[in-house]
């Protein structure tokens, strides 16, 4: 049985200045069992740390990943040096419905 899931990706900037910005994928609806890629691109004048957080309904924020120049190759699909860091969820379930945040620190 396929049911639709709503993923809401909010654009948010952490510790930002006018020279730092983050752009994320907007709201995404996918079928249960499908894969989804949530994109995060950024501009920064320095060497940032990029964070992905998730907020499930009625739950506090949870850290999904922390990415720096040193460890950016450890995460699938992205490279902080290329100023993008997508996150991929495979075989999405209804329980994955949440707000996903990409933050630049």
From Swiss-Prot:
Swiss-Prot/TrEMBL GO biological process terms: adaptive immune response
Entries under InterPro entries matching the protein: Ig-like_dom, Ig-like_dom_sf, Ig-like_fold, Ig_V-set, TCR_variable_region
Signal peptide boundaries: 1-19
Disulfide bonding pattern of the chain: 40-102
Ranges of residues in domain Ig-like: 20-105
Domain of life: Eukaryota
Entry-listed glycosylation sites: 39
A GO CC annotation given for this chain: T cell receptor complex
Keywords: Adaptive immunity, Cell membrane, Disulfide bond, Glycoprotein, Immunity, Immunoglobulin domain, Membrane, Receptor, Signal, T cell receptor
Compartments in which it is found: Cell membrane
Oligomer status and interactors: Alpha-beta TR is a heterodimer composed of an alpha and beta chain; disulfide-linked. The alpha-beta TR is associated with the transmembrane signaling CD3 coreceptor proteins to form the TR-CD3 (TcR or TCR). The assembly of alpha-beta TR heterodimers with CD3 occurs in the endoplasmic reticulum where a single alpha-beta TR heterodimer associates with one CD3D-CD3E heterodimer, one CD3G-CD3E heterodimer and one CD247 homodimer forming a stable octameric structure. CD3D-CD3E and CD3G-CD3E heterodimers preferentially associate with TR alpha and TR beta chains, respectively.
Function: V region of the variable domain of T cell receptor (TR) alpha chain that participates in the antigen recognition. Alpha-beta T cell receptors are antigen specific receptors which are essential to the immune response and are present on the cell surface of T lymphocytes. Recognize peptide-major histocompatibility (MH) (pMH) complexes that are displayed by antigen presenting cells (APC), a prerequisite for efficient T cell adaptive immunity against pathogens.
Protein name listed in UniProt: T cell receptor alpha variable 40
Source organism of this protein record: Homo sapiens
Source species taxonomy: Eukaryota, Metazoa, Chordata, Craniata, Vertebrata
Gene field: TRAV40
